[in-house]
Amino acid sequence: MLKLLRPRPWVCNSCLNRVAFPKPYPVGSRSTRWLSTAQSAAPAVSIPPVNPVPADHTTSGTHDDALLGKIFDCSSAWRDFSARSAKFPTENAGLFRNAYLTSPDGFLTFAQSSLSKASAIVNRVLGASTIEEYKTIVRDLDRLSDLLCRVIDLSDFVRVTHPDVRIQRAASEAWYMVYQYMNQLNTMTGLNDQLGKAMENSDVTKTWSEEEMAVAQLLKLDFMKSAVNLPQAARDRFVDLSQRISEIGSDFVNEMAPEQRRVVLPSSKFQGMDPQIARRFTKHGYMQLPTMSGEAAAALRTVHDEETRKAVYLAIRTASSRSVGLLEALLKHRAELADLAGFESYGHMTLRDRMMAKTPESINKFLVELSKNNAPRVLQEVDSLLQEKKTLLASPSATLNPWDREYYIQRIRNAQGKNVKHDNFFASYFSVGRVMQGLSRLFTRLYGIRFVPRETLPGEKWHPDVRRLDVVSDTDGHVAVLYCDLFYREDKSPNPAHFTIRCSRAISEDEISEAAVSTSEGGPAFGSPESAANDGMAASRGASGGPLKQLPTIALVCDFPQRDNPLSGSKSKPASLTFASLETLFHEMGHAIHSVLARTSFQNVAGTRCATDLAELPSTLMEYFASDPSVLSLFARHAETDEPLDYDLLAERVRSRGRFEGCDTDYQIILAMLDQAYHSPLASSESFDTTRAYHDLQREHSPLGPDPSSTRWQGFFGHLFGYGSTYYSYLFDQVLAERAWKKVFSSGQDGAALSREAGEHLKESLLKWGGSREPWRCVSDVLRDERIAGGGEEAMALVGSWGTSNKSTMKH
C-alpha cells in the first residue's frame, strides 16, 4: 500500500530527453547500507513560533515585486537581503525549519520519532472495532502515510541535493529506515482488511466526504497492487519479483550500451562537420567517433556524405544484445508479476491506479486517433525534406532514407535561420529576476497569489544560493513555501525538477494535543503545540482562522548559468535565460502552482498527487504562457536598455523551431505505442521479440516507416523502466493543454492569458482538487465539454482526434 504513496519528483520528459541515457530518480544511490555507528539525538533548541502570515506580508505588493526581482538579479541586493537573517536568534532552526534537522544526527531522531507515531497509528487501526473507530480509518491511514512521507520525501531530496556529504549520508540512513518500515507494512493484511470493513459499512461511509472516499478508494487499489490478498507463498513470490524487477531495471538503465562503441571511418568522409570536433576525434587519418555522443548526433545533422551518415545512424540505432536482453527480462518479469496479482498484463495492473485511461485499450484508441490526426503534417514535412534532397542532388528520383532526415532538417533550418535571432539575443530580455517577477505578476492576475521574498533562519537552507519565497494569497494569507535553487553548481543534477518536500494536509486538534504532550517529554523545543504538530515547518489556519493545515513546501531546482558569485563584492550582470530555459522554468512552475493551489485536507491527494496522466497538464499549459505576448509584456525587457522585447522576433524564432514538430510527434506516438505493446499480454509469449514488435509498429502506424531491420533501438528506451505502460501521458497532456489554452484562454487573444476569470475557472475546475476528484470530471469542466465527462474508450479516442498543432502556427 504505502510504497506507492510517495510521488516521484517531477523530472519532465522534455528535460530527460536532454541526456543520452535518461536515468530514473536515484533510489539508494548515495548509500547502500546503514552506518554501524550509533547516532546521538539532535540537541534541543528553542524554535521561535512561526506566524501564520509573516509580518512583512502586509507590505505593499509593489514592494514585494521590486524586491523579488532584485534578490535574483542584483548581487548587492541579495547580499543585503541575506544579511537580514542576522537579526534572528543564532540557534539553528533546522533544514526547512524542521526542528529535528539541526545536525546530521537529527535525521535519525526525526525518523525514529516519526516511526514511533506511525506504529501507534497502525495499532489503532488494527484494533478498530466500533463504528466510530472505523469512521476515522481513512484519516488515520492518511496520517500514517504523511508521517512516513515527511521523512522519505525530505530525505530523498536532501540526499541527492545537499552539498554536505555527512548530511547526505544521514538523510540516506533516515530514508532507508522508514522505507524498510513501509515494506513491512506492505506485507500486513490487517490494514487492508480493516479498510475493507470500513468501506463495506454504510454507517461509516455515509459520514465520509467526497475527498475522504477518494482517498479510501486509492488506498484500496494500492493494497490490491501490493498483492496483500494473496496466500503467503504468492506474496513472497510477489516481493521477490518486485525486487528482481528493480534490480534488472536499474541495470538496464545504467548499463545500456550500443553494439558498436565507435564509428571508425576515414576523416575525409566527415566533411561538413565542425573542424574542431573532427580534429579532436581524428587519429592517423581516421575519425573515431563515440557512438553514443553529442558529436555523433551532430554528424547526422552536418556530414555531407550519405554513406557516412548511414554508418553513424545504424550504430546509434543499434543497442547491444545485453541491453536488449535486460529489457526483455524486465518485461517478462513484469508480465509474471501482473499475472500473479490477477491482472491480464502489466499494463492492466498499472493503469488501475491513479490513471485516467484505465485500460490499455483506451490508450491505444487515443494513440491511433492522434496518429491519424498527425499523419498529414508528417507527410507534408517529409515531402519538404525529399524536395530539399532532390534539389541538392539534382536527382528527381532521389528517395529519403532514415539517415537523411536530420541532415535535411538542418539544411532547411539553416536557410530559414538567416532571419531568425539567436537564443543569446533573447537572453538579454530574460534575466532570472525579471522572469520571477513576471511569474508572480501572472499568478497575481490569474489566481490572486504572489511571491514574497522571505528571510531564512540559520540552518534553514542547504546552500547560500537558495532563495525562500512565501506564496501569499489575497484572500487566504500565507499558503505555501517555495525554495528556489536555480543556479548551476558542479554538484547539482542538470535536470530541472519540482520536489514536494511536504504536502498539504489538515492537522486535527487531537494531533495538536498529542504534540503538546510529546514536546513536554523531550526532543526539540517548539514555540507552540501547533508548531510541534508540523515539526516546526510552515503551517497556517488561514486568514479566517480555520483548521490548522501544514502548508505545501516545495523545492524548485534548476541549473541556470550564473555570471559570477552573487555574494562576492564585484559588480555583476544578472543571470539570464535562453527562451528554452524560460519555457523550462514556466513548466516547472506549473507543477509548483498545482501543489500550491491543491491544498487538500488529505496528503494522499494533495497537489500533484493526482492521476499520473493528468499531472503534466498544468505544467504543459504553462509553456503556452511563456510565449504569449501579453505575458511577456509583464517582464521581458532588455537588461541594459530597459527596452521591451519585440515580440515579432520571438514569434519568428518559435516558428522556426517548430518547423518539424509533426515528425517529432510521430516519433513520440510510436514510442508510446511501443510501451503499450511491451506491457501487453504479448510479453508473456515465449516467442515475444522486442525488435520485431518495434519495427512492426513503425511499419503499421508511422508515415516515416520502420528502422532498418538490423537495428534494435529499443535497448536505449530507458523510460520503459520508470514509466512502464504510462509513456503516453505526455502526449495525452499535450493535447489537453493545447485544448485548454484554446478553450479557456482563447489562445491568448486580446490579453486572455491574463484573465482572472479564466484563471479562476482553471483553478476551480481542475487545480484546486489535486487528486481528490474524478479527473475526467475535472477536465470536462475545464473544457466545458460533457462528451468526455464519463471517460472510457470513446473519451480517449475523442481527445486523440483533437490532435496537437504546431505552437508556432497558433494565433496569439
From Swiss-Prot:
Protein's UniProt name: Mitochondrial intermediate peptidase
Give its localization. Mitochondrion matrix
Query: Where in the sequence is the transit peptide found?
Result: 1-35
Q: Where is this region: Disordered?
A: 518-544
Q: Explain how, and how many, cofactor molecules are bound.
A: Binds 1 zinc ion.
GO BP? peptide metabolic process; protein processing involved in protein targeting to mitochondrion
What does this protein do, in the record's words?
Answer: Cleaves proteins, imported into the mitochondrion, to their mature size. While most mitochondrial precursor proteins are processed to the mature form in one step by mitochondrial processing peptidase (MPP), the sequential cleavage by MIP of an octapeptide after initial processing by MPP is a required step for a subgroup of nuclear-encoded precursor proteins destined for the matrix or the inner membrane.
Report which reactions are catalysed by this protein: Release of an N-terminal octapeptide as second stage of processing of some proteins imported into the mitochondrion
Report residues binding Zn(2+).
587, 591, 594
Keyword terms of this UniProt record: Hydrolase, Metal-binding, Metalloprotease, Mitochondrion, Protease, Transit peptide, Zinc
Family indicated by similarity: Belongs to the peptidase M3 family.
Q: Which organism is it from?
A: Pyricularia oryzae (strain 70-15 / ATCC MYA-4617 / FGSC 8958) (Rice blast fungus)
**Its GO CC terms?**
mitochondrial matrix
GO terms, molecular function? metal ion binding; metalloendopeptidase activity
At the top level, the lineage of the source is Eukaryota
Catalytic residues (UniProt): 588
Q: According to its UniProt record, which cofactors does this protein need? A: Zn(2+)
EC number(s) from the headed UniProt entry: 3.4.24.59
